[in-house]
Amino acid sequence: MSDSPSRRDFLRITGAVGAGMMLSGVRPFIAQAEEVARPQGVSLVPESEATSLWYPAPAEESRIIQQGLPIGNGRLGALVGSDPADDVLYLTDATLWTGHRNDVLQDDGQFPYGPNDFGSFGLLAKVRVQVTGHTKAAVGDYRRRLDLSNGLVTASYRVKGAQYRRETYASHPDDVVVVRLTQRGGGVHSGRIRLEPTRTETVAGEAGTRTISLQARFDNGLRYAAVVTAFSDTGTVAVSGNELTFTDCRELLIVVSGGTDYLPDAAKGFRNTTVEPLTVARDRALAKAKVAGTALLNTHVADYQSLYRKMTVDLGESSRSQRNLDSWSRLAVRHTNPGQPDPELEASYLQFGRYLMITGSRDSLPINLQGLWLHNNSPDWYADYHTDINIQMNYWLTDRAGLGRCFPALAEYCLAQLPEWSRQTQRLYNDPRNRFRNSTGKIAGWTVAFSTNTNGGLGWWWHPAGNAWLCQSLWEHYEFTLDAKYLERIYPLLKGAAEFWAARLITITHTYPDGSTRQVLVDDKDWSPEHGPQDALGISYAQEIVWELFRELQLAAAKLGRDKEFAAQVKDLQERLYLPEVSPKTGMLQEWMHPDDIGERTHRHLSPLIGFFPGDHMNHDVSPKATIEGIRKLLEVRGMESFGWACAWRSACWARLRDADRAYQLLLTVMRPSIANENGTSANFFDMYRNGDRAIFQIDANFGAPTAMLEMLLYSRPGVIEFLPALPGAWAKQGRVTGIGAKGGFEVDLAWRNGKVTSAVVRSVGGTSTELRAGGWRRQVSLRVGETLTVRPT
């Protein structure tokens, strides 16, 4: 990402699979085929034991993006304010996008990048729940929580001796947002519910069904709707104009449904013309309002916990005084007292990243720059899908954190977009206006631009190596799972990307520092994200990621028994690729084929390190010592200060270098409180960074920093699992983490004391052999699929 939205302003001024593939991974917004199964014996984690973020006051609506608590089911999401008198939900649907296929180039060779051509993610509506008499002056003992253990937002408070409680969540099985108001001690709820449009939609009330609704259609043809209903068997609920009113309700159940006619099928224009969103939303809201509130809650919690409980995190004990602090104060105290570790806070931060993944990526579109959570209809960079770090960083966490079921959203998105990406590549990539066009004149396969939308559209400049970086993410999921069916599904993406590079690479004569020369293959004119220059040959970023792409294609073809001749061609190309050198002048790994110290030394991107992390073909075992030292030198020059996502990437790289102190310090930099719009973590734990007089929310650091934490605890690549490679001193006394994913098809439970591994449980989820390491200890192990092995390194 750029360091400010000025790029968007500038752009405003400057102005292989078969079509029709239906995707199993994305649920369209249609009538549910059967009743949802209601689980029995569900046990919520008690508040006193739950991992939670908590606050002594409601969110201020003017700061909802920094203070509102997020809920989501992968498609529907909301930011929740939890004001007893005036609660508000900023509601979103992941498929609600303006914009088009955007398949034209401007005179400067860029794709248009505005809200009407490229498009933007936006709000579906606001839902407001106003309760009479529950004003700030009347309320006591207020507390709101984001309950990470159970997957819901709660608010509790007292009014005139009665104790009130509010639960808000987005259910994945029932596909609705639920707000449930309860009380103990003789209290009642009276007030009104409003559905507030964020554009020019009109809200209508329907007395016969006791619903309020809105519907509209964008210029791109996307139809959408939202419906709210409420039920109480202890009071009165009615429609008054375009509002719902409720009177003397001891308990009140509010159900919100909404959706669009988006369909992940390029052949059908990404629209399901047979669906009427308003009808589906109304029917669903009414059906769910007939279900008991406890049953809805139990169904949601059982589903959520089936993912959340895949990993437990214990990094050590915090003090009682730390636990007594609300979450925002706790962030501040940790920052101002760097010598006083708060391991439970850091464990909660990791679990918050997992919560965002569970709630943001479930058989849906993948997580964009802001996930499901917005506060207006003008998100920075349109909350798009950026292909030069952001969407990839969003998915680093999944398999490492026991959330492999959340990953397919990314793969299915790429598959759904592939027909359009291929078509636009064939038609527009070698256009004379594209400064990155192939000088070979050849074109094949597919690639992307730096920005992508949900409708097959591309934005900003072409990004030649964006295809390879997406494939790296897709391949990494395979390395964790060894799922052959998944590999077969993504194979067209791998092959098409490799075909693109087979057509693009050019041959040059390169002179090495010792005076020797060699004919090598290099990337044509390109741009090292987002550093420049725009017309460089053989940028390290592309050379490394294409080398990995070619390896992936060969392994996939061999596994699936396909394309033997093409795989052999790719192997030949891979062997002739130029690979980055360490500069004899600076000692750094070069970003370009140039030994001088050029560029912005503290640039936010680590593009030349993509082969070190998230890639792994540069590593301690196979890379020359000089290369590892060149990586270290480059990281030192890049520094320890940047935006959240950039610090997260740095942290993961330092963990790979086994430098626990610097990896941990960068984590603390990400977690510093964002005060006065500075870079850091906001009250609701969203990552923010400064832009002028405001702070921008960008979600990638919320996944990248937890990934770095897990990299401190476990490093893996196929054939190697290393325990505690970079354990910070703050966590060293004692800890235990269960469910860490390891490449090669394994899961690991890890326990330690005084900085040493006390036990490790290794489970095969598809792998059969690997080497285990802990310090100087080594052990080669073989397991059957499903088998478990416990080791105690000595």
Residue ranges of model-derived segments:
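N-terminal export signals
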Residues: 3, 9-31
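Acidic/His metal-coordination segments adjacent to aromatic residues that form catalytic metal sites
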Residues: 371-382, 444-460, 524-539, 682-695
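Inter-helical turn/loop segments and adjacent helix faces that build the functional surface
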Residues: 401, 474-489, 508, 553-565
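Aromatic-residue-lined binding/catalytic grooves and analogous aromatic/hydrophobic interfacial grooves
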Residues: 36-458, 476-478, 495, 543, ...
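Non-catalytic carbohydrate-binding regions of carbohydrate-active enzymes
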Residues: 475-481, 485-486, 497-507, 567-600, ...
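Acidic/histidine-rich catalytic neighborhood
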Residues: 496, 500-556
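Well-ordered alpha-helical segments within folded domains of soluble proteins
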Residues: 389-399, 463-475, 541-551, 605-616, ...
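Short, glycine/acidic-rich hinge or "gate" loops at secondary-structure transitions
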Residues: 364-372, 489, 506-523, 562-569, ...
